[in-house]
Amino acid sequence: MEYTDRYKAFCKRMSIYRKLMDYDQAKMAVRVGMTTPEYSNREAGRSMVSGIDLRKFSDSGADIDKMLVDVDEKPCRYVISSEIETFGEESKKEYVRGVVSEHILYMCEKKIADFSDDTVKYIRLLKSIDKDSTKDSMLKCIRDVNGITDQQVISDNLGISRFKYSKIENNKELPDAMVLIRLYDLYGYVPSMYLNLYDVRSRLLDYIFDSMSQKDQEIIMNFINKLDPGLSREERKCV
């Protein structure tokens, strides 16, 4: 295993998180579904923390982005994702997510110069996700946004084999902690986006919406309400 200062810092934060919870290693191991030796080896950096391990940490209440790359959660009101959730059946929510995404992208692209670099980054990623028919591979979209056509280029950048990279890109394997740290350093998207912890498209819509002007936000909200004009927000929840 290649040890870097960034990975060592992650292991240290893992230890701090455990101690803040007032857990010894045995109790923490139980909380994240490991044996005590398995947990001890991961915290000490003797074994790589896998993507599955990180999902267990997330399920236990850990802030994965803070733990991995020392980044606080981006302030967000989650307006769009909350509205989408009121549409009931998953097929309907996916339809709403798609048309709202198209509408927001259309509005943003006309005013792209008004947004911060971070918001532009989210807009470009959302546009790429919308182009991807499966809408479930962050790494495909990362390659698209950065104009990388050859998997070998990004696998070399990450220091992993093309075979391993291909498995991760095609959702046959979750990226481990070291890969996630490198992805963040290279492209700036937080690790949790690669671990299927939430719907990335909905999260991007929330971030972008918060950056829009109040007038444009009102236009978006009116658009959403007109998608089901016969029902109020509260009534949609009950359907």
Report the location of each language-model feature:
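A short, Lys/Arg-rich alpha-helix, primarily the initiator
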Residues: 1-20, 93-147
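Key DNA-contacting residues within the recognition helix of helix-turn-helix
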Residues: 11, 40, 68, 166-167, ...
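Alpha-helical residues within helix-turn-helix
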Residues: 16, 27, 141, 152-153, ...
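Short alpha-helical DNA-recognition segment
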Residues: 22-41, 147-167
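Residues in the helix-turn-helix
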Residues: 27, 38, 48, 66, ...
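DNA major-groove recognition helix of helix-turn-helix/homeodomain DNA-binding modules
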Residues: 50-68, 176-193
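Short, charged recognition helix plus adjacent turn
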Residues: 69-110, 192-239
